[in-house]
């Protein structure tokens, strides 16, 4: 397990008081206005104001914790939506509009060329529908993930040319298609690129390149996704304020924005809020069928619903089959056909989940067979014929588990590997991969996610090169802390105060759902959920208790029992039960009550030592155990079963300041064969190995490393 610190933000008490008062007054005035037929006495106003102050404190606390301390700024944020900037401020938007409008006037066929992910599909649908509504002769085309790969290809361009089309408009791709753009130009095809990815030094040859991340672009908001840029293009073609365009295609832009994990701030917040409202009352048969399929018909739709229910199904088409299925659903105008497609996408998504778990299992078996891979700063895993459509998700899962950058590569029958990598905050995966460009066939991406192609015979060299770069650039790779907003007490929480947090939504990138810390909470029970795939804990503070689900953690993996006292990092929500509205939680992390951040800091040093990172004498001394401490650790492991994947309860028992020494002791005992991590009922526990002769602790490699000067 990767241990990480918790960073609970500090709140200025004076600012909190001022914010609470401002929010309460605003809410009271709104209530008075809504009840303007009723005359309010001064006494009633004061009474309502006092009640509002009680309920506004939690919301004000989150705002203050996130640095929003000015009441005017806070009220503006809570009021709703930022104005959308003029689409014509995007560089080359005028050129793009001029060429497209000319094509419409002259009856030219326009090909909208998208991508196979949700952003690419929604961007394609958005622009296709709008151009069709303008009377254009328009077709759309999506690449195949396996057959074509990402973005424009010469084969696709040739196919478009052979069909007599002479204008291509890309959405969510094209900014890096330098060779392909030159090929299109050589055939006499005009190319308009709309994209949101970071350009390379050389821009493609095109009639227009609309990308807010161009160095010479002066539009105010740079966080648009591909569907967001397509939305701006539609507004520019219409010559209307973009807010008006939201009424027609805000749902598509919102789904693309959330699915592509774009920051839900600024203009994206406006787009997504409008799109979510539209989704709840959508008249698109495709979205109606999909909402019915996932059990959201007639219910409020949130950004989280898009992330965890809608987007995975739309994405599954491009991962496992053809993204055309997702596009057909979004564009479908027949209810029966839409229902068929929505059900098909769910079936494909189940297939995706099964395939993903097979590869996760295979990857874990690799790590179990070669545990030294876990000491790598960058974990590179590969396998024959792993489905390339899901290796990115597998990489994400392994990053969550290991706390390190992970690249997963699928090797085909021709000996070529296609890889997808995910990173952690503070480690630029793209730069790391770029340092190996001479042995790669292709690569691309950004700091947090990247892809590559490599020959099978170069994979071992690639593993070494990646880790050499990481050793130079990030000698001690610390896991980013868990950012917590507020420490709260259950006795002081109310259903209404938690409900008011909805004003901060939509939640997503750069605007995460609030994280709360429950200190000194007593575990009153651990229960299996969904046949043991997840678990639910009952936690008590004072006179109040709450049920909190822990996704992906089955009961046997929980290193806490009834009666244990813990600190819990959780998110809060409200659900309707037969007993009325109730609070519920989702566990993010648990640790023993009072355990601070020293444990995570020392665990990072031990991890660095095991990877061969040179430590200072002071650092070595801080984690070097005396023989007596190793004996103490051995006796603890002998006395009871300790979870191998989460030793925080042992850290708390033996002293947080001894965390590094405890981890070194466990590693040394394992290295000399005195203990082993055994799988028992789906969880790993440390167990003693029956003695087979005398063991010498001094032979443990980790202790030898500490002795080196």
Regions flagged by a language model, labelled:
Residues 10-13, 41, 52-165, 187-188, ...:
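Hydrophobic helix-and-loop "lid/oligomerization" segment in the mid-to-C-terminal part
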Residues 1-54, 59, 569:
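Extended, charged alpha/beta regions that create polyanion-binding interfaces
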Residues 126, 205-242, 246-258, 629:
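Short alpha-helices
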Residues 19-20, 27, 49-74, 584, ...:
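Structured, non-catalytic alpha/beta "coupling" segments that mediate domain-domain communication
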